[in-house]
Amino acid sequence: MTGVQTCALPIYEWLPMLPIARAHGAYLYDVDGRPYLDAISSWWTCLIGHSHPHIVAALKNQLDTLDHVIFGGCTHEPAVALAEKLCALTGLDRVFYADIGSAAVEVALKMSFHYWQNVGQAKKVRFVCLSGSYHGETLGALSVTDVALYRKTYGPILLEPIITPAPDAYQAPAGVSARDFAIMQAGQLEQLLAARSDEICALILEPLVQCAGGMRMYHPVYLERARAACSTHGVHLIADEIAVGFGRTGTMFACQQAGIRADFLLLGKGLTGGVLPLAAVLTTEVVYQAFYASYASQRAFLHSHSFTGNPLVCRAALATLEALEAEDTLNKNRALQVAMAAALAPLSEHPNVAEVRQTGMIIAVELVADKASRSAFDWRERRGLRVYQHGLTRGALLRPLGNVVYLMPPYCITADEIQHLASVITEGIAIAVA
């Protein structure tokens, strides 16, 4: 990489970027051949491992036939087949393609708003999100993101959301179960929708795990109550499963654990096995019909991108879904979930660990300055970064979220590799809190 300037931020002057040359399975390899176990699936995307042979073969074959075509006035087999497969998996009726997760959020927000305009409820212009939520970094997605740094920086140009308290079990008072706390928080949502549904288009949430917000986890009963409240008060429910879909929470989709169907289901990241960018917005026939009208009516949904429905990305997604099914991945993951829990359980006794929490193939360790009070380390001390640095010396790619160290590995990881990562994290925490 001689002559290539990669120092985009001051941190890279003393902590250089990893020059990755290739990847296979659960590993990344730098230009010198050094392996790094990808503990975070390269930002939660490479579900079944890097360079999966079935995906690679499917892409090579697709590239020989159709690489790209405008998706306005044209269609093609990969896009149709993928839409049919996604509808069959989710129980929803219609699919709108986007390229990245943030774009899918934009589509859902616009489509919900536009739906209400088309059916004559023009006062519905507001969105509700959960405290601590994260839905992406385009302007619309940031508008329903409750992260202080983003709102402080971009607040003047963002929409103003209505924020309702999240059911984050970590915040539950002593002696209150995760389920009871979720019901308590759902009660506040129910009151909000009852009072202000005439101005609210939709509630958007991340089912079961608020990932970028610190791997905050909550009980499925909140989703049940949220679905019921939205249905009662005529508000759309947008389920952002971009990070947690396709088995990450233990079921194919997180919403299944609550037995609910959202009005909009957002998918991305692992949809293509992490090979290419693709996102999808699934919705109901009711929503679709609100836009199905003549040109003269001017009721059509207004959203398009140059690479919408690209044949290569659709083929990669189909291959990913085929591999998940053929390899019985979700059933096999049960043993990996047990291995993750067992490997990191000892850390729950550490004096600087407030909690080890897990949902499916996500497990997180919350570092604190004091266990009894759960007082946090000063964010400026960057304790999580110290764990990351140690991981690199031991051939592990971690990416803590502040003081939360987590594993979100590819499904091809082994029990031995999980144990290795647990050892690396344990060592890293000892260094970080010293």
Identify what each model region corresponds to.
Residues 1-7:
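Single conserved hydrophobic/aromatic residue that forms the stacking wall/gate
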Residues 8-434:
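Conserved N-terminal phosphate-binding loop of PLP-dependent enzymes in the Aspartate aminotransferase
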